[in-house]
Amino acid sequence: MTMLALRLGLRSVDICNLRLSDICWKSGTISFVQQKTGQPLTLPFPVEVGNLLARYILEGRPKCDLPNVFITLKHPYTRLRSSRCYTSSLAILGRKKSAADVRGLHIARRTFASHLLAAGNPVSMISSTLGHADESTVDEYLATDGHRMRQCAIGLAGIELTGVLI
């Protein structure tokens, strides 16, 4: 689950709604309708993500007739809820959510966007890959790009501080 957010930028709700039929192994793509925007999205997945998905489906996913890729590990099986997506990912890794984990799986989505920007991809492509309906929505994701943010800083040379600084 974490790799789908980190390597494809998927929202947790879309990860939890992902169905086995949404994965095309021949073309190496995932196609689905986004929950938030209602827009269809098709993304290629890297081989490592495909291998992890295949391993989970074949070796980790409980055997059942549910169409969802990610399901609860205990009977009665149901699809995972997006509110449990991150904690379920941690549980698989043998970890627990800490009080500092306020963003959950969404931080992986931000990291994905920052990596695309650092690689020189245009904002329009990043926005499209994230499935945003409005290109300006991507700005909050890109604020984590410290290198480019430092280029926006204004120099303070020649400006004197007066008064008391508390």
Model-derived regions, located:
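Catalytic-site neighborhood detector that most strongly recognizes the C-terminal catalytic loop/helix
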Residues: 34, 130-155
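Conserved tyrosine-mediated DNA breakage-rejoining catalytic core shared by Y-recombinases
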Residues: 8, 12-13, 17-51
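C-terminal secondary-structure termini that scaffold catalytic or DNA-interacting sites
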Residues: 157-166
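Short pre-functional
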Residues: 1-11, 30, 114-115, 157
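A short, glycine-centered helix-capping/turn motif at helix boundaries
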Residues: 4-17, 119-121, 132
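Short, polar N-cap/turn motifs at the start of nucleic acid-interacting alpha helices
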Residues: 22-25, 101-102, 121-140
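Active-site/catalytic core of tyrosine-dependent DNA strand-transfer enzymes
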Residues: 47-100
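Short, basic (Lys/Arg/His-rich) helix/loop patches that form interaction surfaces
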Residues: 43, 87-128
